[in-house]
Amino acid sequence: MSAAGTGEGAAAGSATVEGVVVGSLDAGHLDDVEPLWRALIDHLRESDSVVELVPHELSWPRRRAMYEEMLVDGDSFALGAWRDGRLIGYAVMRVMPPDPVWYTGTHFAELTSLSVAPEERGAGIGTVLLDAVEDRLLARGLDQYCIGVDTVNDGARRFYERRGFRDGFHLLHGWIAGRRAVGAPAPGAPPETPETAAHGED
């Protein structure tokens, strides 16, 4: 644990799990994250994500580079959860300048990743990590953040909704090729009815 983080104590009211230590995860120990990232992508693949997933051999190098870039900017941060010296979960929070449209306070914060080892799921590790993330945000004067959840990841959605999160945005994904060629909806798009067509935004 000492090499990967500081092991800050949990704030009053934050969840704890016996034998689990939560602390900072720095850019020098991102290689420990790869199995947890792979587990997250495997879970999405098993859930039949709407958007095709990038193969592991491409996905992790890209994600690792993104984490490295985020963790050197001074505002974004990552936390890890360790049991017996082994990383069993992690969370990455991107902290950016305030949004120009939506009021987000002095900064805009987004949870970009939260993953727990498959054998540790259901033990409260995600709750411990998210409590620690929120403690850190509150200490910086930030009282809100957003999370992107894959449409098919119902378990994650329920987890965040239990914490009070609600739909704020919808990110729609569409395929241009084919639709323009034949004037038909892309694969997977709902059929258009006279009623829905009348309420379009053209």
Regions flagged by a language model, labelled:
Residues 1-31, 39-42, 181-202:
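Conserved N-terminal entry element of GNAT/NAT acetyltransferase domains
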Residues 41-66:
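Conserved GNAT-fold acetyl-CoA-binding loop/helix
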Residues 64-80, 110:
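A short helix-loop-beta-strand connector motif used in the catalytic cores of GNAT acetyltransferases and
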Residues 80, 86-95, 110, 115:
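Conserved beta-strand in the GNAT
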Residues 81, 122-130:
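Glycine-rich acyl-CoA binding loop
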Residues 98-111, 121, 143, 168-169:
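A conserved beta-turn-beta hairpin within the catalytic core of GNAT-like acetyltransferases
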Residues 117-119, 123, 151-152:
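Active-site acidic-Proline motif in GNAT/NAT acetyltransferases
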Residues 127, 131, 139, 143, ...:
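Conserved active-site alpha-helix within GNAT-family acetyltransferase domains
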